[in-house]
Amino acid sequence: MKVRIRYFASVREALSSSGEAVDTAAGTLAALRDELIARGGAYASALARGKAVRMALDQAMSDEAAALSDDCEVAFFPPVTGG
């Protein structure tokens, strides 16, 4: 399936990319994250397990168990605080 990925803030800076479209067999956010980590290099560092990275699916905050669908939008970003 095709998935649109967007990267924000420090994740965007680490990957030198604001986003990409990928073909994936991943069924969940967790599986997609693992596919990206497996690329190695900046992806492994920016999206590493244990690193504080938040995810959104179709512009709604989601946990790793969220199911992907064809042509969905996934976003990766660091935690954000406000005041």
Write out the residue ranges for each language-model feature.
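Ubiquitin-like/PB1-type beta-grasp interaction modules and other compact soluble beta-rich domains
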Residues: 1-81
